[in-house]
Structures are given as structure tokens and as C-alpha cells.
Design a protein with these regions (language model features):
Chain A
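Active-site-proximal alpha-helical scaffold in enzymes
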Residues: 83-114, 142-179, 217-223, 333-356
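Conserved active-site and cofactor/substrate-binding residues in soluble primary-metabolism enzymes
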Residues: 23-31, 45, 63, 87-91, ...
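Beta-strand segments within the central parallel beta-sheet cores of soluble alpha/beta enzyme folds
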Residues: 44-53, 78-84, 108-113, 161-168, ...
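Conserved active-site "lid/cap" helical segment
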Residues: 1-87, 95, 152-159, 182-188, ...
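Conserved catalytic cysteine-centered active-site region
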Residues: 2-4, 54-111, 115-133, 137-144, ...
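Short acidic, glycine/serine/threonine-rich loops at helix termini
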Residues: 20-22, 63, 94, 119-125, ...
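Condensing-enzyme catalytic core mediating Claisen C-C bond formation in acyl metabolism
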Residues: 1-26, 165, 197-262, 266, ...
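Short glycine/threonine-rich loop-to-helix capping motif typified by GTGT followed
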Residues: 58-67, 247-252, 286-310, 321, ...
Length: 390, 361
């Protein structure tokens, strides 16, 4: 059988900040949706189904999708609520794809939202570990990434300076993105290294912020895309791969991202990617910590294994390099968790549509977006200006 | 495009009990998964991925599918978690098969309600600004709904007790009870009594679903996942709690997509945890009113039979209920043929509705 071709034609984001005192979480979600729909003169009447992502323990609202049913525009419509951790926004996009590719729906709205200032994200993230074996020793995201980054340093020889360069690139790129949270135009490598250790080797400025924000996309079927966007972002791959549940079961985690490699292998095959450095024009990679971007680039085949440090030293992933990575500023600049991975997909779509404004990379034809969550889980999407051939 | 039909080829349940303190969540899910794999004749290594259904709040764990994705075949493969009734997970799994991306998947729903404090969890589902200060829970909301529904319909707690008794009689999990015994249980939120609500349980259900090619090549006994539909309803304080037009709309859409008439259905599964909600939902589907409606729940013959294995009131867990009903229906359709409409609800007072249509050869 042949899947129905699917394309992202509209995106919308809030202007992400640490604390939105002016809006509830429902209002934040709706703001992103309204911006998304308004960008193409769409209304809720045009939408057949809604897919929503949020990590509800972060804000402490059980069945948050049911509470927000009107804010999400879902009254009288199918509402799929996904909940997969950091990946959830990308899981939303993957679900939108399947709902369209299967022929079930023509126009699907995907939305991810989080108002972290309403709750305690790290307390909730601590519950992700097995209650008997893991919770006492791996609390929250920072300790997790510190362990992984240490492994990665050991395996690849990457230095703290090289990681700091990634942190600087992200915050400089963010200055050109009107929606980004952490914009630090004058940040230097020295300042990153001088910021306190949260947990070795992670400096405070190596780590993503905690944001309030939301992101929405509209994905549509086949021919209806052409009338809605001059250059629709066609989906060429929408892949998910997980690793095992216990941290100790993932050998050399982060240095070796088995789920990312598995997802990339399938996605590249589907989209005909032979050399990712050459074949992609831009990548939006889910890098909660600076080290993660380098390790993920290695595992995505953008460089050789162990060569992540050289990638940043040689400027290959800078805005003027052959493969700009995270022109939006990435997760290190913006992290409303339920939306974060959908922002990767939306930013990749903006680049393909040629509508990224000041952070537009010239002549983008193919873009990569990834989501990361749970215990080294991956969602991966490949978007292109070319409509997939059946 | 030509969509590939999806089929149910394996069915498995974990032993359902008020407290499965002999197993953890992973083991509970594996009990259902291994039973379904055995039923279908597959090994876990052959499975391409899974759609799971669970709720973080009941599981006390953010990303609650962390506990099960490994035993659901998710290692280096695709697992997605739906935080809704299992019928929504089944609808998502159908789309993954129909577009040709996945060929052989598991659909797994699991809940260990014994490990949570129900009031704390349910309170978290209420509006934090205006409702939580009143300290409500699901039964408080359902009590208000029952009061309104009884006033509107003329039905009484005695009628609901007969619905519970019918479910208990068919249940493979719970002991039978007479309507009088149900009416003698303590008041929880007037007019509701304790036994008007399905008891909290530890439960897991798994279905093996595959595409046409695998079903044919293996010549597997199978039930077709014909189509489905879903409709979200308004927040519980923003709607008439005595009706469920969203269920009717979802059922009508699914039947129209399938080209079926309502009278061609041989079995209907209604997913709601309170007896008065069962009556309300059946009424919304046009299955009758008043005494005649109650008799439909008690009838063991005549099409369509309602909750022929007892449904949610017969013993399962929230989030699992819709998938457990689909499994029971599929089991019958595989043996005897027929057409089933399986419903699952998510939200306070059965807010949102999903239906899936199954057909046995």
C-alpha cells in the first residue's frame, strides 16, 4: 500500500520565557494554536483531529487534555493525548503523520505545551526512574546528563571547551529567533566554563533552561498542502525508536545512542539519505545539554564517531557552515518540555518552507528533526520541499 | 491510496484482581503480552512496535510506559504511549498499520490501581483554580451526574443495581451479586452507592494487530479492525451531563465509514465505570429508554447484546477498560463471527468517546 503524502503547512509558537504570569497553561497552548492557524487563515472548522502532548505530572493536572478540550479546539473532534517524555512533541508530529498517511484525516492539528513555572519539573522527572532501583540514585535531568556526558568525554575525548562552544552557538543563534527564550548575544566560551558546575561536567550554561511555552503545527494530506503553503514541508520519514528502560541497560549511553542510530537508519533509508552532512541542509536536534548535540551528531552519522568535538571546532554546524545545527537556538535556548520536540519539527518545517525569518538558512531543501526523551528514546523526522513519490 | 486493513490476531489478559501484589507493573503487562503472543503464535522479537495506554497519575510515574515498553517490543523499535482509554490506543495502532509503516504491533493497556490513592489521583483531574478547593473526586462528579440523569430519565438506583447485577453475573472476575446486595452497599455520593462503581483493579490487556499480508501468510484466526471514530465532549461543568451526543456522533461516523446499519451489530461494548453512565450511554446510542433499556442490559440473547462479558462493571481497570472490551468482543467474533461496536470513554463523567468496529468472519 502507499501512504497518503503528508506535509506541514503551518506552525505557531509562543514567545518562550521562564515564567508566563499573564497566561494560564491553556491560554499558552491556545496562543500557539491561534498563531499557527492565523498564519494560513485557517480556523478550527478546517481541522479534523487534534493531537496533544504535555507531561501532566509536571503541572499536576491529570487528564489535562480533557480539561483543556475547548482551548485545544477539540470539542466534537478526535483528540489523541500522547505522553512520552521529552520526545512527546515529536511523538505528536509522528502521530499526526500516521493519522494522515493512513487516510483517516485530511487536516490534523498537533500541539505541545508546558508551563513549567506552575509545577516542579525535576520532581516529576525523578519519578521516571524505576521506584526500587533508580529513583534514589538518578534524580532529575541534570544528574542523568552529567553521567552521560562523563561517559561521552571518556569515549570520545571531547573537551569541556568544545561543549561550551555548542552552548555559545545555541545562545547566539537564539538571538535571531523571535520565539527563543535564552538569548545571550555576548556569551563567551570562557563564561560558560566559569559558570558553576551543576553536576560534573555540566556547567549551568551547558544545560537547557526551563520554559513556559507551546508550539502547534498543522499537517495536511496530499493536494490540500499546495494551496496552503508556497513550499509545504513534506514528511519523508517519521520514525520512533526506544532503548531499554534501565539506564544501566544502555551501554555507554549518549556516547552510543542506539535508539538514535536505529531511528536514523530507518529514516535515512526511507528518505534516501546517503550522507547526512551533504544531504541535509539544516538540522534541529534535541540537545538538552551541550554535550548531547555533539554526541547526537556522531550517532546521526553527521561526522565520524568520536569526531563531535572537531565538528564544532571546524564550524561545520554554525549558521554559515555546511550543515547548520539548531539555528533556532535549540533546546539549550528554549525548553517547554511538552512542546520542545515539536519545536524541533516546527523549526525544521519553517526552514523547509523558507519562512524562518532572521534565522533562515539559505536554500533549504531537506531538514532533519529529532526528539529525545525518557531513557535515550528517539523520534526522528525528515522534511523536504519535494513531495514524496509514491 | 489503498489502505491496508488491520487485523486482531492475538488476545491476552493478565489475571485481574483488586491487588496484584505478586507482580510489578512490568510483570503484569508481560502476563497479558505473553498470553497474546502465545495466542497469535509470535515471538516478542518479531513485533515491530507497540502503542500503549496508561496514565502517569495512576502509575505514579512520569512516562508511565517506561515500565512496559521493553516487554512490549519497544527496544530499538517504535512505541508510543496514549494517555487515554485503550480504544484510543487501538485507533492509533490501526492508523500505523493502515499506512503501511508498521506491519505487526502490540496494543497494550495497563493499570495498577491498587498502588494509587484514588482520591488524590482523581482530585488532580479537576480544575485547579475553581474546583479542587471543594475536594471532589470522580465519584462526587458522577453522583451529581447520576442525580441529574435519574431526574431526567425517570430511572432509579434500583435500575442501576440491575445493570450491575447483570454485569456481575457475566463476569469472569467478580462474584455475582443480587440487586438487593448492590442497593445495600454504602452510599458514596448520593444517589450513588459503592457498588454502582466498577471496583478498582489491577489489570492489563494486550492485542496483537497486523496487516493483511501477515494475517494471510500465517493464515491466522482473525478479527478485522474495520474502522473507528472519536469525539471529545465539553468539560463536565460545561455540558448537560445527562446526554452523550458525542458518543452518538462517533458511532454514527464509524458506522457510516463502515457502511453498516446499527441493526447489523451483534454486540455492543460500553466503556464507563458507573452503572448510570452505562444506561445513559446506551440511551445515547438509541438502544431504548426506561425499563426496556434496563432489560437490554439483562438480556443474554438477541442482537446486539450489551457488555456480554460484563464490561467494565464486570471487572477491569480504568484506561484498560476499552481495550479489555475489544479483546472480549474479538474473542467472540473470532469464534462465532458477527459485528461489534466497542466504546471507550476518557474523562470525568465519561467526557470523551472513542469507538471501534470489529468484524469476525
Amino acid at each position: 500500500m502507499t501512504p497518503v503524502a503528508a506535509a506541514i503547512v503551518a506552525t505557531g509558537q509562543t514567545d518562550h520565557v521562564s515564567r508566563r504570569l499573564d497566561a494560564s497553561m491553556a491560554e499558552i497552548a491556545r496562543e500557539a494554536i491561534d498563531r499557527c492557524l492565523a498564519s494560513r487563515n485557517l480556523s478550527f472548522d478546517d481541522i479534523d483531529a487534534i493531537v496533544a502532548g504535555n507531561m501532566e505530572m509536571f503541572e499536576g493536572i491529570y487528564l489535562v487534555d480533557q480539561f483543556f478540550v475547548d482551548a485545544l479546539g477539540a470539542l466534537g473532534k478526535p483528540l489523541f493525548k500522547l505522553n512520552t517524555g521529552g520526545t512527546v512533541g515529536a511523538s505528536v508530529a509522528v502521530c499526526c503523520y500516521h493519522l494522515i498517511a493512513s487516510g483517516r484525516y485530511q487536516k490534523v492539528l498537533g500541539v505541545g505545551f508546558e508551563k513549567q513555572s506552575d509545577g516542579s519539573t525535576q520532581a516529576a522527572i525523578t519519578t521516571v526512574g524505576d521506584p526500587i532501583w533508580e529513583r534514589a540514585v538518578m534524580a532529575g535531568a541534570i544528574g542523568n546528563f552529567a553521567t552521560m556526558a562523563s561517559t561521552y568525554i571518556h569515549e570520545s575525548g571531547v573537551t569541556e571547551e568544545q561543549a561550551a562552544k555548542v552552548a555559545v552557538k545555541a545562545r547566539h543563534n537564539a538571538c535571531r529567533n523571535p520565539h527563543a527564550h535564552l538569548k545571550l548575544p555576548n556569551l563567551t566560551v570562557e563564561e560558560v566554563l566559569a559558570s558553576e558546575y551543576l553536576a560534573f561536567p555540566i556547567h549551568r550554561l551547558d544545560m537547557c533552561p526551563s520554559s513556559d511555552g507551546a508550539c502547534a503545527i498543522v499537517m495536511v494530506a496530499g493536494d490540500s498542502a499546495d494551496g496552503l503553503a508556497e513550499h509545504p514541508a513534506w514528511v519523508h520519514a517519521a520514525v520512533t525508536a526506544h532503548d531499554q528502560q534501565y539506564m544501566g541497560d544502555s551501554p555507554k549511553r549518549l556516547a552510543v545512542m542506539r535508539s538514535l542510530r536505529a531511528a536514523a537508519e530507518k529514516g535515512y533509508r526511507q528518505a534516501g539519505i546517503a550522507d547526512p552532512l551533504r544531504d541535509f541542509d539544516v538540522a534541529e536536534i534535541y540537545e538538552p545539554a551541550s554535550y548531547a548535540e555533539l554526541a547526537m551528531c556522531e550517532n546521526l552519522g553527521i561526522c565520524e564517531m568520536g569526531a563531535g568535538g572537531r565538528l564544532i571546532d571546524e564550524g561545520l554546524t554554525q549558521m554559515d557552515g555546511p550543515l547548520p545545527v539548531n539555528p533556532s537556538g535549540g533546546v539549550q535556548s528554549t525548553n517547554p518540555v511538552g512542546a520542545t520536540a515539536l519545536i524541533r519539527v516546527a523549526e525544521a518545517a519553517l526552514q523547509v518552507m523558507g519562512e524562518a525569518g532572521e534565522h533562515q538558512v539559505p536554500e533549504v531543501r531537506r531538514a532533519l528533526a529529532t526528539g529525545y526523551g525518557g531513557n535515550a528514546w528517539t523520534d526522528l523526522m525528515i522534511l523536504s520541499r519535494e513531495r514524496p513519490t509514491p | 491510496m489503498t489502505s491496508s486493513p488491520a487485523w486482531i490476531v492475538g488476545i491476552g489478559h493478565a489475571a485481574c484482581a483488586p491487588a496484584r501484589d505478586d507482580v510489578n507493573t512490568t510483570e503484569l503487562a508481560w502476563e497479558a503480552i505473553s498470553a497474546a503472543l502465545d495466542d497469535a503464535g509470535f515471538q516478542l522479537g518479531e513485533i515491530e512496535g507497540a502503542v500503549t495506554a496508561s496514565q502517569d497519575f495512576w502509575e505514579g510515574r512520569t512516562i508511565s510506559s517506561m515500565s512496559v515498553n521493553e516487554v512490549a517490543g519497544g527496544t530499538l523499535r517504535s512505541e508510543a504511549k496514549v494517555a487515554a482509554d485503550g480504544v484510543m490506543a487501538l485507533l492509533y495502532a490501526m492508523a500505523r498499520i493502515e499506512d503501511g509503516d508498521q506491519h505487526l504491533n502490540l496494543v497494550v493497556a495497563h493499570a495498577k490501581e491498587s498502588q494509587a490513592d484514588p482520591h488524590t489521583v482523581e482530585l488532580a483531574a479537576f480544575d485547579p483554580y475553581y474546583e479542587r478547593a471543594l475536594n471532589p473526586d470522580e465519584t462526587v462528579a458522577a453522583g451529581l451526574q447520576a442525580d441529574l440523569y435519574y431526574r431526567r430519565s425517570g430511572l432509579t438506583p434500583e435500575h442501576s443495581a440491575r445493570v450491575v447485577a447483570a454485569a456481575r453475573r457475566r463476569s469472569g472476575v467478580l462474584d455475582p451479586l443480587s440487586p438487593d446486595e448492590i442497593l445495600a452497599s454504602p452510599i458514596t455520593a448520593r444517589p450513588l452507592r459503592a457498588l454502582d462503581r466498577a471496583p478498582l483493579m489491577d489489570a492489563a490487556t494486550c492485542l496483537v494487530v497486523c496487516d493483511e499480508q501477515i494475517a494471510r501468510e500465517r493464515d491466522l484466526p482473525r478479527v478485522r479492525l474495520v474502522t473507528g471514530a472519536a469525539r471529545s465532549g465539553p468539560w463536565w461543568t460545561a455540558r448537560d451531563l445527562t446526554v452523550a451526543p458525542e458518543l452518538r456522533a462517533a458511532a454514527d461516523e464509524a458506522l457510516e465509514r463502515a457502511g453498516w446499519t446499527p441493526d447489523s451489530l451483534t454486540r455492543i461494548e460500553l466503556g464507563a465505570p458507573y452503572a448510570h453512565q452505562q444506561l445513559l450511554l446506551a440511551e445515547a446510542l438509541g438502544l431504548g429508554e426506561g425499563e426496556a433499556l434496563v432489560e437490554r442490559f439483562e438480556a443474554d440473547a438477541g442482537d446486539p447484546r450489551i457488555n456480554a462479558d460484563g464490561g467494565w462493571l464486570g471487572g477491569t481497570a480504568g484506561t484498560v477498560a476499552g481495550l479489555a472490551s475489544a479483546a472480549h468482543a474479538a474473542h467472540e467474533l473470532r469464534e462465532r463471527g458477527g459485528r461489534a461496536l466497542v466504546h471507550g470513554a476518557t474523562g470525568l463523567c465519561a467526557q470523551s468517546h472513542a469507538v471501534v468496529l470489529l468484524e469476525g468472519r
